[in-house]
Amino acid sequence: MTSLTLALDAMGGDHGPHVTVPAALRALKSHSSLKIILVGDKTEIDVYLHQAEQELLSRIQVIHTDEVVSMSDRPVHALRTRKNSSMRLSIELVRDGRAAACVSAGNTGALMAMAKVLLKTLPGVDRPALVSCLPSVTQKPVYLLDLGANISCDSETLFQFAVMGSVLCEAVDKKSRPKVALLNVGTEEIKGNDQVQQAAQILQNTEQVNYTGFIEGDEIYSGNVDVIVCDGFVGNITLKTSEGIAKLLVHQLKRGLTQGFFVRFLAKLIAPRIQAVLSQMNPDHYNGASLIGLRGIVVKSHGNADEAAYLQAISLAVTEAQRRLPEMIKDRLESILLDINN
């Protein structure tokens, strides 16, 4: 298999190298053709590399910088002043062709701003979108976009999101003609604001997108569709609400299973099944949001991700790079525009 190089913002997130470096080593063990460039403070990074296997170390490069984008940095400020930060240098490695993708758990706004300026959008894409997957009752992932990169969107932007989300689902899950829906306040054709209504009309006339109509919030986790499209304001609130509900359910379940001797006894008997259910409800199980629509691959990890969750984000970046996601999106958009013009 052809070797693949990823750039990791080793300093990003709440835990920095304490999480990013061990996760990188685990990724290297899982992917024999993978190489990783760790960008950050070499002294801090080396603490977690000194006991690593020599074969793994041979596939790691460290680029030193002691500048970091803080979680409190405003996007414009970070873009103008953090020019030697671990985040920016990681993205520049993708821009310069030295890495196929980059992963960061750092400041989301700064990451999106830097990625858009440094990598540029694909032809036919007005704005990049942030997309991640959610669990469903059918146990297949459901992709939701936009998650906050664009607070307000016109109909053309929503249409582009639908195309990009469809291609992402095809690339990552190898699913043929994934079902795409627009998130709305009702399923009737008359429901929704002008932007959603107009986007629906465009999608209905686009054969290359398997558009199924509107979907309401209570159907997000049904598994009836594969891709759900909305603006970033709605998407971000939906995602954060989902994560909050998941944490509440996990808390309530754990609390309920510790009350009373008989309940605790039963809990021990079914512990493996309970653990499996809790794992499916854990947001970290789906860690990794992709910033799609750019000329390069950028994956955003949760800032508080642990080692296993960060590994999920790395694995997602590997998959997208192997499938050449930006090229797939570019080709699909060109094909659709050609159909429209003909």
Swiss-Prot record:
Organism from which the protein derives: Shewanella oneidensis (strain ATCC 700550 / JCM 31522 / CIP 106686 / LMG 19005 / NCIMB 14063 / MR-1)
Alphabetically ordered keywords of this record: Cytoplasm, Lipid biosynthesis, Lipid metabolism, Phospholipid biosynthesis, Phospholipid metabolism, Transferase
Subcellular location: Cytoplasm
Pathway the protein contributes to: Lipid metabolism; phospholipid metabolism
One term of GO molecular function: phosphate:acyl-[acyl carrier protein] acyltransferase activity
Annotated protein name in UniProt: Phosphate acyltransferase
Family as reported in the entry's similarity comment: Belongs to the PlsX family.
Its biological purpose: Catalyzes the reversible formation of acyl-phosphate (acyl-PO(4)) from acyl-[acyl-carrier-protein] (acyl-ACP). This enzyme utilizes acyl-ACP as fatty acyl donor, but not acyl-CoA.
Record lineage: Bacteria, Pseudomonadati, Pseudomonadota, Gammaproteobacteria, Alteromonadales
